Amino acid sequence: METARKSFKTGQGKNNDSVIVIEHVYKKFGTNVVLNDFSLNIQKEENVVVLGKSGSGKSVLIKCIIGLLKPDSGRIEVFGENVPELNHDDLDKIRAKIGFLFQGNALYDSMTVRENLEFPLRRHWIDFSQKEVDALVVEALENVSLAHTIDMMPEELSGGMLKRIALARTMILKPDVILYDEPTTGLDPVTAREIDNLILKLQKKYHTSSIIITHDMNCVKNTADRVALLLNGKCYAEGKYQDFEQSTDKNIKQFFE
C-alpha cells in the first residue's frame, strides 16, 4: 500500500492496461479545495474502491472523470483521451462506453422498467432495431433475476429491486468501465451483499473495469481488488484491503477499526 503517498503500493502506474489515468488533478470551489494533486490509475478488469468520508470529494472525482466537471488543473485520461479537452460530441462517445450507477438509482417514475432500460439504448444507439432492443432489455433483466418486472412501474418495486433494475440499466450497453456512486447506501445488509455479488458477477461476465465510491466497509471488503483512500483531497493511500486492515497509520485505522 502507499500512504501519503506511503507504501503498500501495488505498482499500478500508467501502462498499456490503464483504462483510466488520473494525474495531479486539482479542483476547488471558491476557497474550498476538494481535490488536491489527486492521482490514480484504473487497470483493465479491475475494481478500485475509492474510500472517503462524506464530503471528501468522491462524487466530485466521478463528475470530473465523466466530464460533468472540469478540473482546474491536471489530466484525466479515459481510453487514452484527455477528458477535459474533449468537445461535446467526443465526450458523448466516451460516455457511451461508461456505465454510471447513481446513488439514488435515477429511474424515471413515469416509465415502466422496460422503458427505463430502453432509454440509454435510444440515446446512444438509435439505429438498434426493436428486436435488438427487446433482446438487450431481456438480457439485462435476466442478469439481475428480475425478468418478471419488465412491464412494472418503479413504484411497485422494493428498494433492493430498484437498485438491481438500475444496475441492469447501467450494464445494458455493456460498458467497458462502470462508475458506482454509493451502490449499497440505504440497503439492508442482506440486500447490500446481494448487490456486491451482482457487481462482481457482472464484472466477470462482461470484463469491465470499475470505480466504486463508497464509505460502506462491507462493500469495500466484498468488491475491491484495490482500495484508494481519499483524504484531504489527495490519494492518501492505496493497496489491498488486507494491507489497510493491518496498517497502524492513524488516518487509515479510523476507517478500518
Question: Which stretches of residues belong to each language-model region?
Answer:
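Helix-to-loop junction immediately C-terminal to a conserved catalytic motif
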Residues: 66
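Conserved ABC ATPase "signature" region
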Residues: 130-148
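Conserved ABC ATPase signature
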Residues: 153-157, 161
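A short, proline-enriched helix->beta-strand linker immediately N-terminal to the Walker B motif
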Residues: 172-176
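Catalytic Walker B motif of ABC-type/P-loop ATPase nucleotide-binding domains
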Residues: 178-181
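Helix N-cap at the start of a conserved alpha-helix in ABC-type nucleotide-binding domains
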Residues: 189-191
